[in-house]
């Protein structure tokens, strides 16, 4: 479930130069010029943040159940671009994509003009783990002097350093770049610990026997919510075609709400609609069960009684995390220069299309 500080780091680094050009010249494509197909539906492109997984499941459900069609939309779900979904949305290659407020903030400081219009995940799911067979690591302070399997982001370095220091360590560690997977890097003993997600890799570990010893960010001094996963679009689309944004958000919201209340059926839909991902139904069902039981998308009782609107952006939790990253000097601009001021979460998120 690669959505932020792990797998996206390479895409963020690779798109810096492109963003410099975008900041200077504006968006190269007009994503609001959506064409109508023969049935009168408006064609819309949604880009994955990584491989198909339960983070994306609501979009697949919305397409399968006809929610997009009912809204007058013909949605094409496409693979993530090499430069990342955020860059694709920023320059108009995709109308919408899955991302998170953390990434939106990072890209905004590099010149992107994008916003999150719906937040699916409401609490952190990142877990930082060693193999259970590694008896030298009993808590984060034992990461001191060990080797971190990383995708190369300043963000993950800041998180690990804070967790180690909160647990009484110095916050010093070596790093090795992950190859094909963090699991493989740890198993080959090229690294001692790495990052995973409880709702995806954590489920894989439980089901397929690779036992992990894991620690969570909130327990070790990392404030706010880093994992504010949701749907993004660009500022130009919001200003010039708000009706399109509202239709897409409303239909997508309906898809995620269905998945949250019908997790097994939604799992079957994801497996069917994303055949190239070769997902196992039992695994996807367990991932959804983890999401529902952990209330990762919000408290179902509050959603049902209307005291919480599904999809609301947690700008408070995001800002707490942004401020932490700024304190740790984890932000840089499009030229690689350190930025000491955190992005303002309230300026890169909107709930106006949820209503």
Report each predicted region and the residues it spans:
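Pocket-lining segment of extracytoplasmic ligand-binding domains
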Residues: 102-103, 181-185, 189-276
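Short, low-complexity disordered leader/linker segments with a strong preference
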Residues: 1-43, 351-355
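Short, surface-exposed acidic
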Residues: 170-174, 276-291, 331-345
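Conserved C-terminal helix/tail region of periplasmic/extracytoplasmic solute-binding proteins
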Residues: 315-355
């Amino acid at each position: 479930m690669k959505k932020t500080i792990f797998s996206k780091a390479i895409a963020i680094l690779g798109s810096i130069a492109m963003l410099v050009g975008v900041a200077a010249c504006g968006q190269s494509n007009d994503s609001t010029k959506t064409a109508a197909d023969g049935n009168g539906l408006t064609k819309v492109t949604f880009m994955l943040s990584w491989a198909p997984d339960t983070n994306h499941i609501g979009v697949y459900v919305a397409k399968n159940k006809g929610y997009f069609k009912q809204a007058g939309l013909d949605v094409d779900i496409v693979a993530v671009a090499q430069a990342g979904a955020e860059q694709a949305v920023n320059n108009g290659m995709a109308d919408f994509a899955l991302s998170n407020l953390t990434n939106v903030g990072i890209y905004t400081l590099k010149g992107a003009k994008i916003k999150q219009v719906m937040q699916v995940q409401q609490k952190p799911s990142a877990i930082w783990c060693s193999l259970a067979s590694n008896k030298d690591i009993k808590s984060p302070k034992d990461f001191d002097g060990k080797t971190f399997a990383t995708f190369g982001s300043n963000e993950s370095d800041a998180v690990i350093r804070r967790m180690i220091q909160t647990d009484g360590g110095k916050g010093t560690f070596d790093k090795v770049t992950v190859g094909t997977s963090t699991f493989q890097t740890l198993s080959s003993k090229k690294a001692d610990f790495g990052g995973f997600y409880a709702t995806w890799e954590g489920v894989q570990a439980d089901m397929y026997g690779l036992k992990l010893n894991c620690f969570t960010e909130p327990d070790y001094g990392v404030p706010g919510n880093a994992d504010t996963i949701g749907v993004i679009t660009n500022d130009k689309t919001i200003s010039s075609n708000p009706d399109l944004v509202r239709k897409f958000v409303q239909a997508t919201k309906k898809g995620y709400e269905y998945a949250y209340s019908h997790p097994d059926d939604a799992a079957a839909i994801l497996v069917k609609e994303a055949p190239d991902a070769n997902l196992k139904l039992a695994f996807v069902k367990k991932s959804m069960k983890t999401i529902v039981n952990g209330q990762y998308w919000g408290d179902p009782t509050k959603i049902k009684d209307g005291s919480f609107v599904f999809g609301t952006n947690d700008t408070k939790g995001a800002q707490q995390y942004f401020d932490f990253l700024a304190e740790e000097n984890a932000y840089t601009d499009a030229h690689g220069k350190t930025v000491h001021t955190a992005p303002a979460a309230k300026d890169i998120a909107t709930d106006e299309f949820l209503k």
